[in-house]
Amino acid sequence: MRKLNNSATLTIMVASLILFVSTTVLSQARYPSGLLNQKGNFTSGAANAIGQPFRGLATSDGIIEGLFPIKETGVSSRPVREAAERFLATLNTAELSRSHFAINDPEWRHWSNVDVGIFPRWGISLEEMSGDQKVAAWALLEEALSAEGVEQTRSIMRTEQRLFELNGDSIRYGEEKYYLTIMGIPSEADPWGFQLDGHHLVINYFVLGDQVVMTPAFWGGEPVVTEYGRYAGNIILQEEQNLGLELIQSMNNSQLAKVVLSPDKVRNNQIAAANQDNLTLDYQGLAGSEMDSSQKLKLLKVIRSYVGALREPHAEITMDEIGQHIDDTYFAWVGSDVDDAVFYYRIQSPVILVEFDHQGPVGTLQKNAPGVPTRDHIHTVVRTPNGNDYGRDLLAQHLAAEH
């Protein structure tokens, strides 16, 4: 994999500082000092993480090589490429300067699941876009994502609107505070991609020829159920929640003894979100090889609820790759397995990592107890271990072949 030199690392940190300053100076009169301090902390944390050369998530045994060969899939990426070209054509010079980056730019790694009030983004937000630009942006997402993925994206944004209604903080919350950037030049043969980044919603989408990698991806939200307001009845991430519960409820006592890391869910357990590109994480729980055929199908169904956000047939290609490692796929659980339980689960194999976590409340303290995990706040993350988040393994192979 290519490493950043000291000059590149310094450039990243300076750029992050400029971004932090430029987005705070004009609005400091509106920012509470505590919020500004949080913003500085998140910006520094991202700069420090990005300053480390990318390795990828791996176990303590290190990176497994050769898992992600460049190959023909037979599935055209032309529709999403043309949609990206149409979106770029709507941007003026100033918008392009903050929304279009080189394919190997560290901007790929500059993302977070926290709100825009405490983590500044590059790119152009839906909030800033003209009507034509929004149409082009959504057309890009509709070509990249399945119908379910598009609806989940919209539903998470609607949840963000509910946070604004509950808290009245326009610096932090709003359904269009999501930023779009393009990486590389959309091409039939050369690598390119895009990133959508905002509160509880991050999509990194890499393309090389007809191969697609859509990780890291973060899907979350609070409140999970919108009871009142503009989008009353909006609900998110129930399939991911319920399928995980269905899988653990199928297990016998000897299996549960391996799966359950702790029966008590007392804190936030997610560990592989932002700034964790180089996380070392060993397998825990029950291996697929120790599950019966029905449980393996349930496990694949859980994984499919995440991978299915990717448009077919790219999703099916990804699922085929995951299925080849089903016996080496581990399932781990924290919490109870009763029907209304709060819990955390993790699915990990050489080619995928999924985390689901019921978290403590942040924006719904009006109705949820501080510090107590609730079904009303969900975080999920999907990663490609062993160096292929952001398609980095594919990119490295492509660049090596060019030389």
Predicted regions, residues:
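Bacterial N-terminal signal peptides that target proteins for export
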Residues: 2-13
